[in-house]
Curated annotation (Swiss-Prot):
It is found in: Cell inner membrane. It catalyses: sn-glycerol 3-phosphate + an acyl-CoA = a 1-acyl-sn-glycero-3-phosphate + CoA. It comes from Haemophilus influenzae (strain PittEE). Belongs to the GPAT/DAPAT family. Its main location: membrane. This is Glycerol-3-phosphate acyltransferase. The lineage of its organism: Bacteria, Pseudomonadati, Pseudomonadota, Gammaproteobacteria, Pasteurellales.
Length: 810
């Protein structure tokens, strides 16, 4: 019988290799699932299927996993390396798969009694043939059901490129023996648990059935909240209920997605072609976090940072290829143009207007639609920044969508809701040229199909893309920890805890996005070149600086989620030089090679520097203080950092609390000393003159930030009663003049939003009294600290400009 099965598998192998592509999830199970291939592995499959076995085995061999067709030999005993939990629909039946599996489990458990070093790993594996969830109004089952031989043949032809082999987290048999003993009941329990796992996995891979759009509309229009809003609309505008209902239907039709699985499959092929044309690869990290939440039945809300319009497509593509359901995506109404709008809608986009203010009907409908998505179990994605970042930094969060998410949790949401922050990064952003023009004052070009095609046509060889899933926030757990009253019955629409909770969670999302930063070669090369006032370094200096960056990021990690490049500085530089349209040039003279950034590309490069500015801001501040003082006591350095840190924390969403800050600063000092960038003797720090160039380049990371802070505090010293609006305006004007006089290219240097954030942080740190008057002794102390970290030339320009402004206004 065994020989016949082997022959049958060999017959299947040739057509399947032509029809079915290798699509393992995760892409590298040994690393991502932390598998120990030096211990025996047993693959657990849901049901008997020779077709599935051939596909699964081919994936195992390609991934370097043990061959499932071979047996494990333990202490002279040979046992199968795979088991089936159930019978499949097969031409050649053989009874007793369940009993055989229980017997094999028991033999493995018996071996654990006699060998303490043994730890067999059970790995659940399933082959997913297509991922259609089916429609609500149809009785068809999703394509993950048991298929017979004829059905598998058609599935291989139709779904061959859409077939995935899903490897799940290994279960340690040693752990099971220690925790539960090794009697026969444990073997049966293992089989039961594995069956439940496969059932959950099917749901997490397909998601709930797709809705009948018309039936969903009818249900929503009959909801109490929308009926009330329709009545209010009719009264306020003096129109009939019927006319208000038509308006409500029109709004709902404008908002709602119209997901089509066949459309998703088609766009998957297009996106595969697009990524291959534009990027050399998409690096995905920590997707296991999301798969775990999906298996546990969580309602998942993806909250990525927003770099590019392509973010919408990238995250859905990545999730689909990680064995997860692409989410419903909140997209700006500006993307609802022909033909893109209809296509986006079929891929899961639902459209949102820029503002709801004054439109209670729209607000009620949108809120109920979002709540309905949560209720039905669809994952959702929205961009908390509200729009794409033109500077490469995270924008301040817009809290509207988060507020509606918490309202959905309040109102009869039974499944736990987990927010998944997502860091999205690129070595080249498609729209970066447009961003630079907009920052110079050009009008924003309206989105249209021609613009999209022009952008894509021009670009290729853009390096890598990065998607890193940050630490999830389960809302019920967060609220119970920080706002224990949240579950108390309260008939107010917004109880007292609600607004602080929305603000705190939104801020924590931004912090977790930054904790999951993916550092790439462009970020590091750009940071080093922009740190030089002439935007040029010798090749040796640049490589030395890249090495210093790399060592500090490895030895003093910002967080455990940060992803670092694992190539040499030389390889980083060569990679950047090979990218198209970057503006990094090599020039040669009698003394060697100079790496230079073209002047026209300096503003573009600040975008990539700003992506990781939060990682370098503390080392940069330490370097800046030591450089300006030349020699300083550790205590004085720490004191200066504590004064400035709250503003950096607010602006760049840093995660360190006071105790963690002290630890981080000491580690940075130790690392600089280890690299011989500074001298450290007991409580005394000083520059190392032979490495002062490295220290200078490190210090540049906070140069412009401190200059901005100094502008605002100097204005407050001169005009302690100035209004907030006037303070923002005058700070911006002084910064614009400073940028012209001193050649500062950073686009965020005179951005109104960064001044607004700094002034808000001043208020939070009590630099203003209750009547909004400046607390002068505090502001003068801060001004004194800042003035020691800024060049005399800059200080004089700032003071001179402010005095001139006072003369003109008097």
């Amino acid at each position: 019988m065994a020989n016949f099965i082997n022959m049958y598998r060999q017959l299947l192998s040739l057509p399947l290799s032509a029809l079915v592509k290798n699509n393992p999830i995760p892409a590298n199970p040994i690393e991502e699932l932390s598998l120990n291939i030096h211990q025996p592995i047993v693959y657990v499959l849901p049901y008997t299927s020779q077709t599935d076995f051939v596909i699964f085995r081919r994936n195992c061999l390609a991934l370097g996993l043990p061959d499932p067709a071979e047996k494990n030999e333990i202490n002279g005993v040979k046992l199968p390396r795979y088991v089936y939990l159930d019978e499949g629909r097969r031409i050649f039946k053989s009874k007793g798969a369940k009993d055989e599996t229980t017997t094999i489990f028991n033999k493995y458990l018996e071996l654990h009694r006699t060998s303490e070093s043994l730890d067999v790993q059970l790995i659940p594996v399933s082959v997913l043939w297509g991922r259609s969830p089916g429609q609500e109004d149809k009785s068809d089952l999703p394509n993950l059901r048991l298929l017979n031989g004829i059905q598998k043949t058609f599935a291989a032809i139709w779904f061959g490129r859409d077939t995935f082999v899903r490897f799940s987290q290994a279960v340690s048999l040693r752990y099971m023996v220690v925790e539960h003993g090794s009697d026969e009941k444990i073997a049966q329990k293992l089989a039961r648990v594995a069956k439940m796992h496969f059932a959950k996995q099917r749901i997490s891979a397909t998601g709930p059935r797709l809705p009948n759009r018309q039936a969903m509309f009818n249900k929503l229009l009959q909801s109490e909240a929308i009926r009330r809003a329709i009545e209010d609309e009719a009264k306020s505008k003096n129109i009939s209920i019927e006319k208000a209902q038509k308006e409500a239907y029109k709004i709902l039709d404008e908002i709602a997605a119209d997901v089509s699985h066949s459309s998703l499959r088609a766009v998957d092929r297009f996106l595969r072609w697009l990524w291959n044309k534009l990027y050399s690869g998409i690096d995905v990290q920590n997707s296991n976090r999301v798969r775990k939440l999906a298996l546990e039945g969580h309602e998942i809300v993806y909250v990525p940072c927003h770099r590019s319009h392509i973010d919408y497509l990238l995250l859905s593509y990545v999730l689909y290829h990680q064995g997860l359901v692409p989410p419903h995506i909140a997209a700006g109404i500006n993307l609802n143009f022909w033909p893109i709008g209809r296509m986006f809608r079929s891929w899961g986009a639902f459209f949102i207007r820029r503002t709801f203010k004054g439109n209670r009907l729209y607000s009620a409908i949108f809120r109920e639609y979002l709540s309905e998505l949560f209720h039905r179990g669809y994952s959702v994605e929205y961009f908390i920044e509200g729009g794409r970042s033109r500077t490469g930094r995270l924008l301040a969060p817009k809290t509207g969508m988060m507020s509606m998410t918490l309202q959905a949790l309040q109102h009869s949401q039974t499944r736990p809701i987990s927010i998944v922050p997502v860091y999205v990064g690129y070595e080249h952003v498609l729209e970066v040229d447009t961003y630079a023009k907009e920052l110079r004052g050009a009008a924003k070009e309206k989105e249209n199909a021609g613009l999209v095609l022009r952008v894509i046509k021009k670009l290729r060889n853009l390096g890598q893309g990065f998607v890193n899933f940050g630490e999830p926030i389960t809302l019920s757990n967060y609220l119970s920890q920080h706002f224990p009253d949240w579950k108390e019955q309260n008939h107010e629409e917004k109880p007292q805890w609600f607004t602080p909770a929305v603000n705190n969670i939104s801020k924590q999302v931004m912090i977790n996005i930054n904790k999951a930063a993916a550092v790439n070669s462009m970020n590091l090369v750009g940071t080093a070149l922009l740190s030089s006032r002439q935007r040029a370094l010798s090749r040796e200096q640049l490589l030395e600086q890249l090495s210093s960056y790399q060592q500090l990021l490895q030895n003093v990690p910002y967080s455990t989620d940060v992803v670092l490049p694992n190539v040499t500085p030389q390889a980083m530089l060569e990679h950047v030089l090979a990218l198209d349209r970057i503006g990094v040039l090599i020039e040669k003279d009698n003394f060697g090679e100079i790496v230079r950034l073209e002047r026209s590309s300096a503003v573009l490069m600040t975008y990539y520097r700003n992506n990781i500015q939060h990682l370098f801001v503390l080392p940069s501040l330490v370097a800046s203080i030591i450089l300006h003082y030349e020699a300083i006591q550790k205590d004085l350095l720490l004191d200066a950092i504590r004064k400035i840190y709250p503003f950096l924390q607010g602006e760049l969403f840093l995660h360190f609390n006071e105790d963690e800050l002290n630890v981080q600063i000491h580690q940075i000092i130790n690392e600089f000393a280890r690299q011989s960038v500074i001298n450290s003797n007991d409580n005394f720090l000083s520059i190392n003159k032979s490495k002062v160039r490295i220290l200078q380049l490190w210090s540049a990371g906070t140069r412009e930030i401190l200059q901005r802070y100094y502008i605002t505090v100097t204005i407050l010293q001169k005009q302690p009663a100035i209004s907030r609006a006037e303070l923002e305006k005058e700070s911006q004007l002084v910064a614009q003049r400073l940028s012209v006089l001193h050649g500062i290219n950073a686009p965020e240097f005179f951005d109104k939003a960064v001044f607004s954030s700094f002034i808000a942080n001043l208020k939070e740190q009590r630099y203003f009294d209750e009547s909004s008057y400046t607390v002068l002794d505090k502001i003068e102390e801060l001004a004194s600290t800042l003035s020691h970290l800024i060049s005399t030339e800059i200080c004089l320009t700032v003071k001179g400009t402010i005095e001139k402004s006072e003369d003109l206004s008097s």
